[in-house]
Amino acid sequence: HFNGYWRDVGTIDSLWEANMEVLDPENSGIDIFDEKWKIYSRNPVLPAQKIGPRAVVQDSLITEGCQIYGRVEHSVLSAGVVVEEGATVKDAVLMDGVVVKAGAVVKRCILAENVVVGAGAKVGGDGPIAHVGTGLTIGAGATVKEGAKVFDSVKEGEEVC
């Protein structure tokens, strides 16, 4: 018999929701800092996170090896993520090795491993969760609209709905 938090994360939306619930322990009941609740994971051996002098980080979980020089709000960043100066990440889940270039805006989305979001690109919005698949590049100035599911790289300046 199981008592406590459980969520099926078999969809993009449910995976995003579960990550957002980790950021809200008062309402979700998830306290990852509770010493009685063990977390079993495979953590890469990486240096500590680096938060740059002009970076802003609010209500977020930032894993080892991340380099934050821009703005990160209410987001979960996995190992080795880079957010360049002038970039904004909000209400997002970024998997290992994601790079968000200067001036890019990433909002309400999941970016899979090793995605590169080019300078000035926009991914997601205020509506349904956007998703960008593993290893893809979103070109500089490109736009990936809210709710889009991207499985091929997006060229510079291109728009994907």
PLM regions: where:
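Left-handed beta-helix
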Residues: 1-161
